[in-house]
Amino acid sequence: MTTSPSSSADLLPKSWDPGAMESVIYQKWLNSGYFAADPASTKPGYSIVLPPPNVTGSLHMGHALEHTMMDALTRRKRMQGYEVLWQPGMDHAGIATQSVVEKQLAINGKIKEDFGRELFVDKVWDWKRESGGAIAGQMRRLGDGVDWSRDRFTMDDGLSRAVRMIFKRLYDAGLIYRAERLVNWSPVLRTALSDIEVIYDEIEGELISFRYGSLDDDEPHIVVATTRVETMLGDTGIAVHPDDKRYQHLVGTTLPHPFIDRELVIVADEHVDPEFGTGAVKVTPAHDPNDFEIGLRHNLPMPNVMDVKAVIVDTGTEFDGMDRFEARIAVREALAVQGRIVEEKRPYRHSVGHSERSGEVIEPRLSLQWWVRVESLAKAAGDAVRNGDTVIHPASMESRWFAWVDDMRDWCISRQLWWGHRIPIWYGPNGEQVCVGPDETPPEGWQQDPDVLDTWFSSALWPFSTLGWPQMTPELEKFYPTSILVTGYDILFFWVARMMMLGTFVGGDDAITLGGCRGPQVPFTDVFLHGLIRDEFGRKMSKSRGNVIDPLAWMDMFGADALRFTLARGSSPGGDLAIGEDHVRASRNFGTKLFNATRYALLNGAALVPLPALTALTDADRWILGRLEQVRAEVDSAFDGYEFSRACEALYHFAWDEFCDWYLELAKAQLADGLTHTTAVLAAALDTLLRLLHPVMPFITETLWQALTQLESLVIATWPEPSGISLDLVAAQRISDMQKLVTEIRRFRSDQGLVDRQKVPARLSGVEDSDLATQVGFVTSLALLTAASNDFRPSALLEVRLGPNKDRAVVVELDTSGTIDVAAERRRMEKDLAAAQKELASTAAKLANADFLAKAPEAVVVKIRDRQRMAKEETDRIIARLAGLQ
């Protein structure tokens, strides 16, 4: 049909170009102040803190997923009438940032000690101002609706004050102490590391079994095995299981160390697995976490045999001064000379911790550090979830939460760095120490502790320090506790648990309780844990595999909306997400489909006006409006349960499969018949659909909705309320039957090789009995049929079973004579058959390959099987069609 120009359609570009449009739209949002939060507002508050990315970082796919979810939640709540604060900020990232600046200095042959601490820290601040925070621009590219006027940094003055305040309070409460305990030690960075900064990789090493005690089998001796034979220089004991009869007679005795004047005590400990190896383990308390615990239980000496550079020291042996790896070879050779080597396994694959930043092998090492005593804090964090003050989504993650907080070890909070929050402890000339709070002055002449705090310590204060704590502020009153924390399950312990511990520790403060006007608070009422992103085959992304996806590249190719929709559609609570380029391309195509549908509606005069009474509408109108209300309810339910995938699936299938593929086609027929109210239904459906899609696809929906409504912005539009229109079941059944009838006729046309758009004479019977009299026009139009003439001679017949119970039928007689070029159709089908048979052979060969089946991920095998099944079905279909081709 012909369409007349529409001024509303003229507001749209000819096609959707995200690269040209998205940044312009985002800047308009910023200029309009839509994302600014007002603590004085009378609206109910809703707040989310952005997990602060490292100031050194750039947007990775995990960020993109997390930010998409948070942006969707805050956009929806804003539309629902909440005063929304999405708090942005960055983490000072102690080790990462110091490493970046040190590498820059190294280019000019300099090290940080050439400048001294104060000048070096100034240089780090200079780097932060000039080069740090690139991720903020990338967040804008993604469409993050954060309140940029409140952007914070974990070393801001206000946040630094909060850090010193809570350190002082924890110290005064006896919850911070200094002790020599085992840590992850980086010999390159020369600092303790947190567990999350240690990456475990499989390496090929060696497993050396050697003998302590006599070389005579009839005399007391024990064989032990280790992958770090150099650590035997620090051995002070040998552990066996108390029930292991092989060694019971030796428990309590000693064996001499072969290189050092030291006796090794043989102890009975249930940690030992008697079935593993020889059932005996060497105990190096200062250089192995399990051995450290055994050493504590049995009061074993704990000599530290490596310095901060992992050089052997203080053993009084020839190995002193050797690097640990040099010593590994030398100790093994010395043991061999004495005849103590029992077995050498080489190569021996095993998992070894490496520094995430510097890449070297981590050395467990006894070190004097500052610690938080976590027992009472962890209990409070656990109780907050047990009591329902904080709810974890999905609930299946609760068990992991309790496993961590109920068995948490004390937290090492000191780092041997220059960049970070300096530990507020001062030492006097005679070894005295004092903790100095933010409003106190250290004694004159005393020296401050040189260490800085673990980055996770300051980020653990993030939910309340960014809102002004320890001061009583309007922001704390309005936006605390925060509404939800969105983060990955992989940092549930490292960040979430620590926020809960410190949040509950200050939860009863006047600043939090508003001077006692409300009870103690938790840092967030809900926690949503998302999974990890994997490649399209379900494999973990890694640089070594070459399968790391850059979200910025995908946004450049397909647009931010497409990336966001892909991530939201693929996510499930707590589940990992596998995506590939085909997924984001499909999302881009979905956006294009929406654009074209809206443009068509506007060109045909779609405008928001009051809808006629339902009785004045057609079956198609009542069906689409009823389905829209069902989808609205499902989307609301899904968002409320943080089921982003369910919301997106409902919207995708409604928009594409029902609205675009069917209702638009029916609307064309209705408009051709002069049913002018159709434009109102089109507009009403699009208005609701675009508002529902806006949280996930904000850019294209903004453009389309503004053209449709000519109103200011979807960002401040209202969220769709229940329409009161329930699905008309009679109308829905008629539409369903009509769709099936049209689909079957179209399938028949395709099988017959009819030319696209070629109309075919047909006669339909059983229409009245099937309650489809009102749908005949749609069937004729959509299936490209013409009325049967007086000399109609059907050459084909098909019967289509209809109705909810398949108890009704419409018989379609068609005259296809003269409509097919048989020779050309045969050539086309033979070409298609060859392609289908090639695919069938290829997939069959893969599935017959035992090596492939053993090594390929299950998801890949399933895909190959699906391809084989479809190729078989296509082959059979074409063969049958060729056989019947006359």
Curated annotation (Swiss-Prot):
PANTHER family: VALINE--TRNA LIGASE, CHLOROPLASTIC_MITOCHONDRIAL 2, VALYL-TRNA SYNTHETASES. It is found in: Cytoplasm. SUPFAM superfamilies: Anticodon-binding domain of a subclass of class I aminoacyl-tRNA synthetases (SSF47323), Nucleotidylyl transferase (SSF52374), tRNA-binding arm (SSF46589), ValRS/IleRS/LeuRS editing domain (SSF50677). A motif ('HIGH' region) lies at residues 53-63. It catalyses: tRNA(Val) + L-valine + ATP = L-valyl-tRNA(Val) + AMP + diphosphate. It comes from Mycobacterium leprae (strain TN). Monomer. GO terms for biological process: valyl-tRNA aminoacylation. Transmembrane segments: none annotated. Pfam families: Anticodon_1, tRNA-synt_1, Val_tRNA-synt_C. GO terms for cellular component: cytosol. ValRS has two distinct active sites: one for aminoacylation and one for editing. The misactivated threonine is translocated from the active site to the editing site. The C-terminal coiled-coil domain is crucial for aminoacylation activity. A motif ('KMSKS' region) lies at residues 540-544. Keywords: Aminoacyl-tRNA synthetase, ATP-binding, Coiled coil, Cytoplasm, Ligase, Nucleotide-binding, Protein biosynthesis. ATP binds at K543. Its main location: cytoplasm. The gene is valS. Catalyzes the attachment of valine to tRNA(Val). As ValRS can inadvertently accommodate and process structurally similar amino acids such as threonine, to avoid such errors, it has a 'posttransfer' editing activity that hydrolyzes mischarged Thr-tRNA(Val) in a tRNA-dependent manner. This is Valine--tRNA ligase. Residues 820-851 form a coiled coil. GO terms for molecular function: aminoacyl-tRNA deacylase activity; ATP binding; valine-tRNA ligase activity. Its EC number is 6.1.1.9. Belongs to the class-I aminoacyl-tRNA synthetase family. ValS type 1 subfamily.
